Regions:
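Glycine-rich phosphate/pyrophosphate-binding loops
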Residues: 163, 168, 173-193, 525-527
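Short glycine- and acidic-rich boundary segments immediately preceding or forming the N-terminal edge
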Residues: 2, 19-63
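Bacterial N-terminal signal peptides
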Residues: 7-17
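N-terminal export and membrane-targeting signals
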Residues: 1-7
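A post-motif C-terminal structural segment
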Residues: 38-50, 64-69, 79-85, 89-132, ...
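Structural beta-sheet core signal
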Residues: 73-74, 180, 388
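His/Cys-centered metal/cofactor-coordination and adjacent catalytic loops
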Residues: 146-161
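Alpha-helix C-terminal capping segments
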Residues: 135-137, 169-175, 226-228, 378
């Protein structure tokens, strides 16, 4: 049994019990008393912001809202509905029980909605714009982090004056504890949306800015350690290279170095700010930290993204699981009597999908779900709002007419009443999971005289191939080097105070307003005028 499934099964019963208690506590209430003095974000006049604020305010007037002390936003990057369904079946089958009727921890949360993920300029958005919608309450252009649609892509000067306050920055100003966790680089789009303000999501280090003036725009890593986010209590993820000088060897991989061209070691600069800070890069260092103390922790466990869950145990220096990081963060942030705001991202679900590698996407979804179960166990349903959602979907499909119990990663095995049988019109078998586009459409067959790969893009025979192998890539229709995002609505699950506002079909940027109003950090629209 795979580690992610084992962790999930061990916590699922407890998560279901927690969710049962949550269902009672999340019932509509006429109480709207804020816990804090609301802070008006600088983006309050943005059209998208105002529209979402008004929509949430109407629901509050109709349903009421209980005040929350804490907020946890779980973002499964690229975790569309088909990913959730496939992961559910995979979890059950891996545990030796019925997969189709299995239930993930996230699915036990009592409130749910569909969230519309389009950006200001794209039907199918990227993670930067969608994450900004959830952390700052406005829709913006794809590729933008923490700036409004008034800016121009890659133009530093145009971004000046378009910056948005994030819920995490507002929470800090109000005295709450704050944290961000991701299995991706901590400067990547989704975690970066908690603090960064750039018109180009790829400006993760100064060396990435390519001609942009560092006097006008700061790279994302520099913003993390120089801005309000420098005082985040817990920062855990990957991406060390963006914080280390180009001449500095990586502490885990001596043959690799940092990526910064300015010679600055931003991790050392962060640690030197006061005596309460600890940096960490491996599992042993993580385990040695007393998260029940007032320590601030900055942990970056890989030069780039953290390992996929399927590969994590083989990591050279070892790294904690997403569940372990979540437990540590909640332990640390709960010390603040005023409450906390935390983001937890399962960032590598998305990367596996881009690679057309469904098994790693499913394994990382289950690791993400185990973190959700841990949060349900550790928090009080009466005072903690938990929202679980995705930033966008992917082109993963569950297709054919496979029989009940057919391995979700296997070939379609049709039953007697199935239309179309188990083979395609070309006489070849196909898998239940496939992608509309991506690298699985072609196979490298040879190299030309210059060493460039040659490809065969005809559908190949899967007979005798282990389609559940770790490196198997599901077949796809349109050949692309990287599979794309999907534009359909994504699921949002919620529990705790304010969860009753997560229902129906909502705009993605309304999630910010639900969180902000529940914890009392942002004012109602009437108070903004």
């Amino acid at each position: 049994m795979r580690l992610a499934v084992a962790a999930l099964v061990s916590t699922l019963a407890l998560a279901a019990a927690c969710a049962a208690a949550v269902a009672t506590s999340a019932a509509p209430s006429t109480s709207t008393a804020p816990r804090h003095e609301p802070i008006l974000p600088v983006q309050a006049e943005d059209t998208y912001y105002k529209s979402a604020a008004e929509a949430v305010d109407i629901r509050i007037a109709e349903r009421g809202i209980k005040p929350a002390k804490n907020v946890i936003l779980f973002v499964g990057d690229g975790m569309g509905v088909s990913t959730i369904t496939a992961s559910r079946i995979y979890a059950g089958q891996s545990a030796g029980v019925d997969g189709e009727s299995f239930r993930l921890a996230m699915e036990s949360l009592p409130w749910s909605a569909l969230s519309k993920t389009y950006s200001h300029d794209y039907q199918v958005s990227d993670s930067a714009a969608t994450a900004t919608a959830m952390t700052a309450g406005l829709k913006t252009k794809s590729g933008f982090l923490g700036v409004s649609s008034a800016a121009n892509f890659g133009n530093c000067a145009s971004a000046q004056g378009t910056e948005a306050d994030t819920l995490f920055e507002i929470a800090q100003r109000a005295g709450l504890a704050t944290g961000v966790i991701s299995t991706a680089r901590i400067t990547h789009a989704t975690p970066g949306a908690t603090y960064a303000k750039v018109p180009h999501r790829n400006w993760e280090a100064d060396a990435d800015m390519r001609g942009a003036s560092s006097d006008t725009c700061k790279d994302i890593a520099r913003q993390l350690i120089e801005g309000p986010s420098s005082d985040f209590d817990v920062i855990l993820g990957g991406g060390r290279a963006k914080f280390l000088p180009a001449e500095t060897p990586d502490p885990e991989y001596p043959d690799q170095t940092g990526e910064r061209a300015d010679g600055r070691n931003l991790m050392e600069e962060w640690a030197a700010k006061d005596g309460t800070r600890k940096t960490v890069f491996d599992r042993a260092g993580f385990a040695a930290i007393d998260f029940a103390s007032d320590v601030k922790v900055f942990g970056l466990f890989e030069p780039s993204h953290m390992q996929y869950e399927l590969d994590r145990e083989a990591d050279t220096a070892g790294e904690p699981s997403l569940e372990e990081m979540t437990r540590a963060a909640i332990t640390r942030l709960s010390r603040n009597e005023d409450g906390f705001v935390l983001m937890v991202e399962g960032g590598r679900i998305d990367h596996a999908h881009h690679a057309g590698n469904a098994i790693r996407a499913l394994e990382d979804t289950l690791a993400f779900d185990a973190a959700i179960a841990a949060a349900l166990e550790m928090t009080n349903a009466e005072d903690t709002l938990i929202i679980v959602t995705a930033d966008h979907s992917h082109s993963l499909t569950i297709n054919g007419y496979p029989q009940r119990g057919n391995p979700i990663l296997g070939l379609v095995t049709a039953g007697a009443s199935s239309e179309g049988g188990s083979l395609g019109a070309d006489g070849l078998p196909y898998t239940t999971l496939s992608y509309a586009n991506g690298p699985g459409a072609c196979r490298e067959t040879d190299k030309d005289a210059e060493g460039k790969p040659e490809y065969d893009c005809k559908r190949y025979d899967l007979t005798g191939i282990d389609t559940g192998a770790p490196d198997f890539r599901q077949q796809s229709l349109v050949p692309l080097y990287s599979e794309t995002h999907g534009g359909e609505d994504v699921a949002a699950f919620a529990s705790g105070p304010g969860a009753n506002l997560i229902s129906g079909v909502i705009e993605q940027n309304e999630i910010f307003h639900v969180m902000g109003r529940a914890v009392g950090l942002i004012p109602a629209p009437a108070a903004e005028e």
